[in-house]
């Protein structure tokens, strides 16, 4: 009879980070919020879809507020006190998400707009009439 081998189970160690970076990508259709440590490793994330919205409602400021609230609660639970915020995109959920992080009791260090702007790159699509 074959001898049974024991499996070694690795336990996930409790993560404590005092400072983090919040990346808010706000498009017209959705808002995606990612919380990383200063090195860029993802800790948690949320979006309009994970907050329970479907279709065009994912792009609303309220959906961004709920998604940011989920991420902020997770950050506070991990013991995070200070965050820097990087905002990308033209969507309507930008300000709502930033206000939610302030209301959650997190100290905001820097709010920076990192929306990519072309230096006369690709030709844009023709104008819709």
From Swiss-Prot:
In terms of Pfam families, this protein maps to: Ribosomal_S11
Keywords associated with the record: Ribonucleoprotein, Ribosomal protein, RNA-binding, rRNA-binding
The keyword RNA-binding belongs to this UniProt entry's keyword annotation: yes
| An annotated GO cellular component | ribonucleoprotein complex
* Gene3D superfamilies membership: Ribosomal protein S11 (3.30.420.80)
Query: Which molecular function terms from Gene Ontology are attached?
Result: rRNA binding; structural constituent of ribosome
The cross-references to InterPro entries, in alphabetical order and at most eight, read: Ribosomal_uS11, Ribosomal_uS11_bac-type, Ribosomal_uS11_CS, Ribosomal_uS11_sf
Tell me which Gene Ontology terms the entry assigns under biological process: translation
According to its UniProt entry, the function of this protein is described as:
Located on the platform of the 30S subunit, it bridges several disparate RNA helices of the 16S rRNA. Forms part of the Shine-Dalgarno cleft in the 70S ribosome.
Assembly and interactions?
Answer: Part of the 30S ribosomal subunit. Interacts with proteins S7 and S18. Binds to IF-3.
HAMAP family reported for this sequence = Ribosomal_uS11
Q: Which family does it belong to?
A: Belongs to the universal ribosomal protein uS11 family.
The name this protein carries in UniProt is: Small ribosomal subunit protein uS11
